[in-house]
Amino acid sequence: MLKPPLPLRSLLFLQLSLLGVGLNSTVPMPNGNEDITPDFFLTATPSETLSVSSLPLPEVQCFVFNVEYMNCTWNSSSEPRPTNLTLHYWYKNSNDDKVQECGHYLFSREVTAGCWLQKEEIHLYETFVVQLRDPREPRRQSTQKLKLQNLVIPWAPENLTLHNLSESQLELSWSNRHLDHCLEHVVQYRSDWDRSWTEQSVDHRNSFSLPSVDGQKFYTFRVRSRYNPLCGSAQRWSEWSHPIHWGSNTSKENPLFASEAVLIPLGSMGLIISLICVYYWLERSIPRIPTLKNLEDLVTEYHGNFSAWSGVSKGLAESLQPDYSEWLCHVSEIPPKGGAPGEGPGGSPCSQHSPYWAPPCYTLKPETGALIP
């Protein structure tokens, strides 16, 4: 059997070796917690086979509460398995730039979910660097840089007080703890006649004046605060203060709303009752139109009584009957040649049809033809 030339044979071995590298690449065994999956196979590898070190760590959120303490928290439930992550922090470009681990962890379901830092550990105007680590995967960590002056949340205003400046003018005042010169405020108020709040911004002051109030209304006021641009660029407002009230609370409801609440049901009931009365009046005053198929009932069942058959009410039928009596009177003429007027069988020229009175009878006078009583 002939053997292929040496150059062609070496070329075939070279192609096979290249294919073997693409299909069966050998990866050295890791010494520590290295990922054993090559980078070009990550997209084709199912998510179940990914190592924990390839998963990102949750984001850390820090808030400074009234520059008294700071909480840095993260979502511990985002981990594939319960993991006690550790938090380390330091301040960039400062004298206190050494890395420190959190000394007071916050827990959620017995797993670390945050860190509490006291006032002495807070440097408000220095860059705060926070690093979250997985103790079981040293290479798995995330670092964030934060400006703490933009993360301050003040306490809600306290000691709200109202003063009467005049008969129709009120002044609202309040106090804050420790941060009066760095706060801006929002005042909301409404009366018991209003459905929504009226909002007014107040800068660098702890008071607000309302120039026109109605003593017959019941007013409610509340205030909240925020770290203003002079000291930071915080976006989070404090909680609302406890409300304070002023005015007459005898009328708890708007009179307009109260009258509507009473008049609308009464008007509806009156309309329904009126419609029922009209319906029964029409039933009694307007007879029903009989149908042709029931004409035989007029003879068989009602014996010719049209009123009963047609549905005319008894009162209406009686109202159509006359309330007087009429008498019939026969008028006769005298014979032309002195004849005696004809008398009836009873000897009277008139037929009396009533036992109470007899109507007058008239005869013709021969000369004039006029009626003579």
UniProtKB/Swiss-Prot annotation:
Keywords, ordered alphabetically: Cell membrane, Disulfide bond, Glycoprotein, Membrane, Phosphoprotein, Receptor, Signal, Transmembrane, Transmembrane helix
Q: Where does the record place it? A: Cell membrane; Cell surface
Q: Which residues lie on this side of the membrane: Cytoplasmic?
A: 284-373
| Subcellular location, principal | membrane
Q: Where is this motif: Box 1 motif?
A: 285-293
What InterPro entries does its record include? CRLF2-like_D2, FN3_dom, FN3_sf, Hempt_rcpt_S_F1_CS, Ig-like_fold, TSLPR_D1
Is Nucleotide-binding among the key words of this record?
no
Query: Residue numbers of motif WSXWS motif?
Result: 237-241
Where does the chain cross the membrane? 262-283
Record flagged with keyword rRNA-binding: no
Under the heading PROSITE patterns, the entry gives: FN3, HEMATOPO_REC_S_F1
> Using the chain's own numbering, where are the disulfide bonds?
C62-C72, C102-C115
Phosphothreonine modified-residue sites: T291
Q: Name one GO biological process term.
A: cytokine-mediated signaling pathway
- Intervals, Extracellular compartment: 23-261
What are the boundaries of the signal sequence? Answer: 1-22
Q: Which residues form the Fibronectin type-III domain?
A: 156-253
Kindly list every residue the record annotates as glycosylated: N24, N71, N75, N84, N159, N164, N249
Kindly list the GO CC terms recorded for this protein: cell surface; external side of plasma membrane; nucleoplasm
Gene3D superfamilies registered for this protein in UniProt: Immunoglobulins
Q: Which GO terms describe its molecular function?
A: coreceptor activity; cytokine receptor activity; interleukin-15 receptor activity; interleukin-2 binding
Q: What is known of its domains?
A: The WSXWS motif appears to be necessary for proper protein folding and thereby efficient intracellular transport and cell-surface receptor binding.
Query: What disease does the Swiss-Prot or TrEMBL record associate with this chain?
Result: Defects in IL2RG are the cause of a canine X-linked severe combined immunodeficiency.
Q: What does this protein do?
A: Common subunit for the receptors for a variety of interleukins. Probably in association with IL15RA, involved in the stimulation of neutrophil phagocytosis by IL15.
Q: Which family does it belong to?
A: Belongs to the type I cytokine receptor family. Type 5 subfamily.
User: What protein am I looking at?
Assistant: Cytokine receptor common subunit gamma
Recorded name of the encoding gene: IL2RG
